[in-house]
A protein has these predicted regions:
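Envelope-exposed proteins and targeting segments
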Residues: 35, 64, 81-84, 135-139, ...
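Beta-lactam-recognizing serine transpeptidase/beta-lactamase-like catalytic domain environment
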Residues: 2, 118-130, 143, 169-208, ...
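Small/polar-residue-rich segments within soluble enzyme cores
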Residues: 4-135
Length: 374
């Protein structure tokens, strides 16, 4: 194996000599020195790993004589793409990951420190490795760079257009749960949008009309209604317990009469939703919450992205819970997505379950963990 190894090194060295001459540099190495520089100063880590697999040089430095002066630098080949998801590390390497995947899987990524001492060579102090450090694992993510780029640009345009404070976009593979792109943008102090908090997992927000599908599925599953059952909506105003439920067209004064469950979904009718759940659960609201539990929207889940102390679990009240007040209007308002707080990732998981034929899959970002390239 010696001939191809030496030839490989010769090619690398000749290439560097030509590059140096093109820059007007003519470096000469003293053959009388005990140590000889065999490669350029800035070979990458992949090449160094390859060299250390060669016979003789795969031993400790005190046996092989191979001394490599390492310089650590963090590089982002895709710039700020998926910056928050990938995460960051502290300037102090000992502290490890600071956010994102870097923080979540810090114990795997950081590896095990080695042992080295410093020796003066040709008037210059150099690090000599006594016990090589053990490399950390590599993470293969589900993120598709092209999809991520498109998602970031699209979300940024929409936020600028609507002058919103923040926004989240998530693209998920239906069958597998792989997140192909995820963007969390917040408005910064300068007015521009940039990656901020992991809102996809932690932003507690009322889901609004997206929750109407949940209410309808529970009522259908419990046999409370059928798709053809109808409720009177009139001009879009319905009073319950001295509070008004309004449909979006109520200002027009148009009398729509009765709407079926199907029509109520098509028109996103708050009145149909509220009357539907009151019919089935007014006297036993806990049964409606049990239906939410069957779907899994109150289940506490862990994610690939650390939430800085925020659990990111849905805040959906339960009747008779002394810590959370349950009023007479909680149930009907909950039916159309109010009086609940659900992170976006939960609603994504729910709708993905519908697209996946009823099978709900937990979204994930870390696809594979690789040790030593395997």
């Amino acid at each position: 194996d010696a001939l191809p190894i030496c030839w490989n090194l010769r090619e690398k060295e000749e290439k560097q000599i030509l590059e140096n001459r093109a820059k007007g540099i003519d470096e000469r190495v003293s053959l009388r020195s005990r140590y000889v520089k065999i490669l350029r100063n800035d070979i990458n880590y992949i090449d160094l790993k390859e060299i250390r697999t060669y016979p003789f040089w795969n031993q400790r430095s005190n046996r092989s004589g191979l001394i490599a002066e390492e310089r650590n630098a963090r590089k982002k080949p895709f710039g700020n793409l998926a910056n928050r998801t990938v995460g960051s590390v502290y300037k102090d390497i000992e502290k490890g990951g600071a956010s994102g995947l870097e923080l979540k899987y810090d114990s795997l990524l950081r590896g095990v420190p080695g042992v080295k001492y410093r020796q003066k060579i040709q008037g210059k102090w150099m690090d000599v490795v006594e016990e090589p450090a053990k490399e950390g694992w590599d993470i293969v993510t589900t993120i598709d760079a092209d999809i991520q780029d498109i998602a970031e640009r699209a979300l940024n345009r929409k936020l600028v257009e609507t002058e919103a404070e923040s926004g989240t976009a998530i693209i998920m593979e239906v069958k597998t749960g792989e997140i192909k792109g995820m963007v969390n943008l917040d408005r910064m102090s300068n007015g521009n949008y940039a990656e901020g908090n992991p809102n996809a997992f932690s932003y507690m927000n009322e889901p609004g009309s997206t929750f109407k599908t949940v209410s309808t599925m529970i009522a259908l599953d419990d046999g409370v209604v059928t798709p053809t059952d109808s409720f009177y909506v009139g001009t879009g105003l319905y009073q319950y317990n001295k509070r008004w439920v309004r449909d979006h067209y109520w200002r027009r004064g148009q009398d729509r009469g009765y709407l079926t469950i199907t029509e109520g979904m098509e028109l996103s009718s708050n009145i149909v939703m509220s009357k539907m759940v009151l019919k089935g659960y007014e006297d036993k609201p806990e049964k409606f919450i049990d239906g939410i539990d069957r779907i899994g929207l109150r289940k506490q889940l862990t994610w690939d992205v650390p939430l800085n102390g925020i659990e990111g679990t849905s805040a959906i009240r339960y009747p008779n819970d002394k810590n959370n007040y349950w009023s007479k209007t909680t149930l009907p308002w909950m039916s159309f997505g109010y009086e609940t707080q659900i992170p976006p990732i939960y609603m994504l998981m729910f709708y993905n379950g519908i697209a996946n034929g009823g099978k709900m899959i937990k979204p994930f970002i870390a696809k594979k963990f690789v040790e030593n390239g395997k």
